Structure formats: C-alpha cells, structure tokens
Amino acid sequence: MKKFVLGIGFMLLATGITFAQVDRSKLPASGPAPEIKIGEAETFTLANGLKVFVVKNTKLPRVSFTLVLERDPILEGDKAGLTTFIGEMMMGGTKNRTKDQLDQEIDFIGASLSASATSVSASSLKKHQGKVLELMADVLFNPVFPETELEKLKKQSLTGLATTKDDPQAISSRLSRAVLFGKNHPYGESQTEQTTKNITLDDVKAYYQTYFKPNIAYLAIVGDIDKAEA
C-alpha cells in the first residue's frame, strides 16, 4: 500500500511539473489542416441545356445525384412561405406512385431521396443507382401535387407559426431580416398566418412549371461512376 501511495504521489508531482511548464497565456499551435482530395469533374451539356458534372470517387460503392436550379432569390409577397412547401409537395406522390409507395421503394433499397424549391437529391449504393435514378426522375417529371398534402402542410406551418409568435428569438430574427434587407426583399420578407393561408395549389403548380427547367439547372453526380455510365 505504501509503494502504491508513493507511486501516485510521484505521478501527481510529475503531472504538476508538466502543467507548470505549459504557458496558458498562448493558444496551442493548430495541427496540420486535413487534406481533402476531390476528383476532377468531367462536364458536359445535354441538348436540353442541362449542365452535368461527374466526379468519380470509388472509395465507397455509392453514387449521389443532385439537381440544382440556378435561379435568383424570388419575392413571394402575399404568398410568403410558398417555397417551403414545394419539395414536400413534389414528394407527395407521382403519376406512377403514391407517397407511401414512393417512400417504401426508397426504403427498400436503403436509398435517400429529397426535394426542395431549388433542388432534388438522391443517393444509393452503386448496385441500386438505376432504381434510385428512376425514382428521382419520377419525382422530378411526374409530381401530382395532391391538394390533401398541401392542406396538411399548411396546417403544420400554421401550428409552427403559432408556437413562435411570442418567441423572442423568432421575433428578433424576423425584425433583423426586415431591417437588414427591407420587407420587400426576398431575404427580408417573413411568412405569416395570412400569407400561408393565401397559398393555393395553383401557386405550387405555377412555381414548378416556371422554375423546374433543364436550361437553368445543373446535375452533379458524385461517386463510383464515370462519365460513360452517366
């Protein structure tokens, strides 16, 4: 026991000496920055104007596809909040699949598929790339925009707005954006209960028909795939 106590004492003493030698008035030197290696992108443009970028990376047997719309920010005005619904509406079902069928097929192959007002993204194992592309294309080209889905999203949004109505942080954020950008700027406007109620199914369809066009978009393909396969 005595040897054990002495050993602990020497350890603490040594540690104390080490700590005493550290100059805590100076920040420790940073380590070397991690090296990020990104493969060189191969690019080409389709006849419809869609720009395609392919980056081959065989580290994992996975492939991801991301379609991005290159559009300027838009002022939603008395329909503020419209763009927050677009992605969910596109994922709400297609001419070929209901929402549940779409979700089941995605889950069955362990893939991911999502959409927003400015993008559609999908990823899967390489062996399922054909299937996930089929599902992505179905969402992109054949959305049916069910009205029941829009009503559900509007109710959820109204509930969310009600919970943040008296939240100091949410109020501060809205005021800050309005002061910085102005209420009539895309970054300064805020979604309200009234603007949410103003949104109609025709607004959703009009947005989709206006902005989801190949000549203002690019498709990034990254993973275990090359230009020939793409």
List where the protein language model places each region.
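Proteolytic maturation boundary segments
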Residues: 4-7, 17-54, 226-230
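Solvent-exposed coil/turn segments that connect beta secondary-structure elements
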Residues: 47, 51, 57-59, 68-74, ...
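Divalent metal-coordination and catalytic microenvironments
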Residues: 49, 67, 84, 136, ...
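Envelope-exposed proteins and targeting segments
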Residues: 40-42, 46-50, 61-67, 81, ...
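M16/MPP (pitrilysin/insulinase) zinc-metallopeptidase core fold and M16-derived inactive scaffolds
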Residues: 66-126, 189
